[in-house]
Amino acid sequence: MIFSILEHILTHISFSVVLIVMTIYFLTLLVNLDESIGFYDSSDKGIVITFFSITGFLFTRWIYSGHFPLSNLYESLIFLSWAFSIIHMVSYFNKKKKNNLNAITAPSAIFIQGFATSGLLNKMPQSAILVPALQSQWLMMHVSMMVLGYGALLCGSLLSIALLVITFRKVGPFFYKKNKKKTKLLTDFFSFGVLYYINERNSIFLRQNINLSFSRNYYRYQLIEQLDYWSYRIISLGFLFLTMGILSGAVWANETWGSYWNWDPKETWAFITWTIFAIYLHIKTKKNGRGINSAIVASIGFLVIWICYFGVNLLGIGLHSYGSFTSN
């Protein structure tokens, strides 16, 4: 009873803090640069609080249930939200490269946690005895690597989608108008790391009366470079986790079912996901692999990940059916 109450409290704390963080972030779009710095510091600290709240929830559930909390969809969703907070923590402590990845991590975390605690999964929050197939030491290794991989790949793919939006968006006078608040409103939403730099450079360019067409291209180039930089590194990390998850899952499958690979729906879509992001990384090794081509592949991968993670669970068939919506 005590553990259930503690889980409930920690879950709601993390959800509330993420909601506040996202609200603070969007409030910064309405204030000028000097006033927004304090808001950004607060939102960063909020993500840290969220990280420790979810960590406490996972440990509490682990102690209460007696097994690593990754046995059903509800627990994996909470773990995925935790993965997004880790991504933000890494960028938060990277002082050399200022960025605002909470533009991706905060909305993603609140969406995932909101879905996990919604009525669709009202039966799953109750901890249950593991089914025989999950009673293995490989549970922690395999599922944690897969979910961490999903989180990193989703985050990197969203950055690639933002890159495409910036690249193909028509440049209008509104985007580069001298009104700082309007300029900040658009650049802040897509910059994820060059907010301070762009606004400061914008003021310098306007004071020096540098050709407007040059400054437009300069701002767009800076945004695209930063988005490409972070998406490549985060996707590379996610691909590593995904590879480790697939390999450990193959070993586990051989121990449980007597075969390394069975081409069940989950395995098939995991392989498709791995292939798409392998193509992405291959494109990035080419001289012309930066920018649009790789971003398009990553955007396709974003959809494939959700099919692999949720679509297969909707079917509730195959060897991984215990993670479906209908499973308790």
Curated annotation (Swiss-Prot):
NCBIfam families: cytochr_II_ccsB
GO cellular component term, pick one: plasma membrane
Functional summary from the UniProt entry: Required during biogenesis of c-type cytochromes (cytochrome c6 and cytochrome f) at the step of heme attachment.
Protein's organism: Aethionema cordifolium
Record field: transmembrane: 13-33, 46-66, 73-93, 101-121, 146-166, 234-254, 263-283, 295-315
InterPro entries linked: Cyt_c_assembly (IPR002541), Cyt_c_biogenesis_CcsA (IPR017562), Cyt_c_biogenesis_CcsA/CcmC (IPR045062)
Gene Ontology MF terms in the entry: heme binding
Family per similarity comment: Belongs to the CcmF/CycK/Ccl1/NrfE/CcsA family.
Membrane topology reported for the UniProt record: Multi-pass membrane protein
Keyword Transferase: no
Protein name (Swiss-Prot/TrEMBL): Cytochrome c biogenesis protein CcsA
Keywords annotated in UniProt: Chloroplast, Cytochrome c-type biogenesis, Membrane, Plastid, Thylakoid, Transmembrane, Transmembrane helix
Places the protein is found: Plastid, Chloroplast thylakoid membrane
HAMAP family: CytC_CcsA
BP-aspect Gene Ontology terms: cytochrome complex assembly
Subunit structure comment from the entry: May interact with Ccs1.
